[in-house]
Amino acid sequence: MKEIKRNSWRAWLLAARPKTLAGAATPVLIGAALAYADGQFQWLPALVCFLFAGLMQIAANFINDLFDCLKGTDREDRLGPERACAQGWISPGAMKLGIIFTIIPACLIGSILLFYAGWQLILVGLLCVIFAFFYTTGPYPLCLLYTSDAADE
């Protein structure tokens, strides 16, 4: 087990799982490339999409970390990368706050896109938040529908 101070910046960085951010950035990059090829590329909406996708990926990682710990799925002796809540690096209460303080900025940043795409985008943002939770939580977690997690370390 790594020696990491409880609720430290290092603990939060490990909980954010930076290696998974490529999975959030790739579809945005593809969309930006398609917009560029069509002559419609704009820097601000592309940057906003990158920030929103990255924050939602981090929020999903925090949610996964918290609920797997609470359900006992992730334990201190788990195989694979260590998880922050299971290791005691971040308390469940602090992780709940981390989820809130990641989703709220994601939604505020994402709301800039309403000026480009209209109010219908609110539904897309809402679905992003819902599926971030349903990946790990609920009666039929999405993470259990597949045999592997390609984006995980």
Give residue ranges: language-model regions:
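Membrane-water interface at transmembrane helix exits
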Residues: G31, A35, G39, N64, ...
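Acidic (Asp/Glu-rich) catalytic motifs at the cytosolic membrane interface
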Residues: L55-L79
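Residue-level signal for inorganic ion chemistry
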Residues: A16, D68, S91
